[in-house]
Design a protein with these regions (language model features):
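Domain-level signal for Mg2+-assisted phosphodiester chemistry and nucleotide/NA-binding surfaces
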Residues: 1-95
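Extended two-metal-dependent nuclease catalytic cores across DNA- and RNA-processing enzymes
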Residues: 29-30, 56, 80-242
Length: 243
């Protein structure tokens, strides 16, 4: 049976955020509360809706581990998220998901990586995620209640777009002054992964930045794919450029 690989943390976080409320108390205190009962109902409904889109698929929900290899690649990775408050009881909610669904996680990587490592288009697998980063993984994806097919070229192009423009939410900057429009212009004539990497390197060099720095950004942006994780030794294999 083919698998639908689901971003458990993304859907779980959304369900929690949808049912978070401010509460004012008589003594002038304000608190944030999350209605876990409604959040669980919302999450369950979301999983049922995903299952209805591809009813012949088994759902496996991907979680990340507490460690992340990207922290050693680029120490500032996701450091900006420390200041953001998470919905109350999020960890407990994730435990509930683990207790009620089939889940998968690997040491040292994020849930997105677990999906990228396992999702196999040739097996008929489907990817369900709310995160645009998963568009860097080729294969069949759920989007707007339907299915779309992302080719290897499209996935590679999305990856190099991320390498060039960075990701503010993940805390890696990419090439200074290069936003999505400029990144698309840099890559417009590149037809292969090798040409995309060459164009990316040239853009970094024009900013007086080294190949090593560009490689750091690429390894932050890279959602691991099949063959890029050593399952026997439980460690990620750092992305190598196509040169």
């Amino acid at each position: 049976m083919p698998t639908m690989w689901v971003d458990a943390e993304g859907y779980g976080y959304r369900a929690m955020a949808q049912h978070e409320y401010e509460t004012q108390w008589p003594n002038g205190m304000w608190t944030y509360v999350v209605d876990h009962h409604r959040a669980k109902e919302a999450f369950t409904k979301a999983m049922e809706e995903l299952a209805d889109i591809a009813p012949d698929h088994a759902l496996v929900l991907a979680f990340g581990s507490t460690s992340n290899f990207r922290y050693s690649v680029f120490p500032q990775y996701k450091s900006n998220r420390v200041k953001y408050r998470k919905p109350a009881g999020l960890s407990d909610f994730y435990f509930w998901i683990r207790d009620n669904w089939i889940t998968q996680s690997y040491e040292g990587v994020e849930g997105d990586d677990v999906i990228g490592i396992n999702a196999r288009a040739d097996y008929g697998d489907v990817i369900a995620s709310l995160d645009k980063d998963l568009k860097t993984i080729p294969g069949v994806h759920i989007e707007r209640g339907g299915l779309i097919d992302i080719s290897v070229y499209e996935a590679d192009h999305a990856f190099y777009m991320q390498v060039l423009s960075g990701d503010a939410s993940d805390g890696y900057p990419g090439a200074p002054g290069v936003g999505p429009k400029r990144a698309a212009d840099i890559l417009k004539n590149a037809k292969t992964a090798e040409e995309m990497w060459a164009a990316t390197l040239e853009a970094y060099e024009k900013k007086h930045l080294s190949r090593e720095y560009a490689l750091q950004m690429a390894r932050c942006a890279r959602i691991l794919r099949a063959g890029e994780y050593d399952l026997d030794n439980e460690r990620p294999l750092l992305w190598q450029p196509p040169e």
